[in-house]
Amino acid sequence: MSKILAIHASPRGERSHSRRLAETFLSAWQVRHPQAQVTRREVGRALIPAVNEAFVAAAFYPEPEARPLTMQADLALSDQLVGELFDHDLLLISTPMYNFNVPSGLKAWVDQIVRLGLTFDHTLDNGIAQYTPLLHGKKALIVTSRGGFGFGPGGELEALNHADPWLRTALGFIGINDVTVVAAEGEESAERTFAVSVAEAEQRLLDLARAF
């Protein structure tokens, strides 16, 4: 049975375009997979703590099996989020682009799930760090909305897009390399122009729902 983990990063709730597009995909996908499990994790309207000193000390404790109870508590949410990632086959991330990057809640989620010894490993080869991803066989779909035009591949503003390219990098680092991005652009442009972009994104998501 397929299991999909949906990460919603917009703080706007029902007014969010990226969230609505992602839910359009989910609805179509569930029609084709009625027995599948869908888990929604809210990171835009719920607080995901930023990494702090206590988290770093606990995450890099030299003997993970012997962590004190206080350190285990510092990593409890992170352990839960990592467990969710391993427990699902498919990852769906809906996010707007804010100031050229992702919202802080999504950044915090990524920081919580990129964990040494859990989602990636680290060794030294002649003193040079070598990294090994520990997630395998998973796919991801990123659904994003952008205020302007031209932030996609080949676009005039592509170099300013540090949102979905950064997500690709972070996901690839832990082993999720099969990543598809669907974007709606132009919310700050004319209403009709944005509507066309949204319609195109919706159609692509409906097509993906048949194959994802």
From Swiss-Prot:
Which Pfam families does the record match to this protein?
A: Flavodoxin_2
Please verify whether the record's keywords include Oxidoreductase. Answer: yes
Query: Which terms in the Gene Ontology molecular function aspect does this entry carry?
Result: electron transfer activity; FMN binding; oxidoreductase activity, acting on NAD(P)H as acceptor; oxidoreductase activity, acting on NAD(P)H, quinone or similar compound as acceptor
User: Which note does the record give on the cofactor?
Assistant: Binds 1 FMN per subunit.
Q: Which domain of life is it from?
A: Bacteria
Residues recorded as binding FMN, renumbered to this chain, are S10, S16, H17, S18, M97, Y98, N99, F100, S145, R146, G147, G148
Swiss-Prot/TrEMBL catalytic activity: 2 a quinone + NADH + H(+) = 2 a 1,4-benzosemiquinone + NAD(+); N,N-dimethyl-1,4-phenylenediamine + anthranilate + 2 NAD(+) = 2-(4-dimethylaminophenyl)diazenylbenzoate + 2 NADH + 2 H(+)
Q: Which cofactor does it need?
A: FMN
| Keywords, sorted A to Z | Flavoprotein, FMN, NAD, Oxidoreductase
Query: What are the EC numbers?
Result: 1.6.5.-, 1.7.1.17
Query: Is Cell membrane among the key words of this record?
Result: no
Assembly with partners or alone: Homodimer.
The task this protein performs is described as: Quinone reductase that provides resistance to thiol-specific stress caused by electrophilic quinones.
**HAMAP family assigned:** Azoreductase_type1
- Which family does this protein fall into? Belongs to the azoreductase type 1 family.
The protein here is known as: FMN-dependent NADH:quinone oxidoreductase 1
- What's the encoding gene here? azoR1
